[in-house]
Amino acid sequence: MDISPLRGYYAAHTPTLMGERGGSAVLVPLVRQDGEYCLLYEIRSANVRQPGEVCFPGGKREAGETAIQCALRETWEELGIPESAVTVIGEMDFIHIRAGSLLRPVLGEVDPATLAAMRPAPEEVAGTFLLPLRELKAHPPEVYLYRQPVEAPDFPY
């Protein structure tokens, strides 16, 4: 057996997460409002998957796009907040979501003056709201463990 094709392939190969299908990014938007930091959430419109879901602005990464570029682009498309109004603090830990892709959150501070001019895209966003961080700190998350058997094709060896 000739393994030269393997040698050629792996000479230029960059390892990635096996099984990752695409990828997405969200902006975790911090806004200083009335002297305290808040998170800016959006409510998904009835026209998209998971209608009524509360989420951060974000979506699928385009080819060659970084998580930061994606998060900023999606924030502009969904909320009308320009890139220039967001100070990126950094990328947060990412998660492998059930859909089979990596979700990469980007923490950023949004200029509060931008909120008055914010124009959510009605086809994607039903509404927005601010939640003070103190509210989240006052209510620790409840964690529920859900186990479901996964049936996968068997490997015969």
Model regions and ranges:
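N-terminal leader/linker segments that precede catalytic domains of diphosphate-processing enzymes
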Residues: 1-55, 60-117, 125, 134, ...
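Sequence-specific DNA-binding recognition helix
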Residues: 128
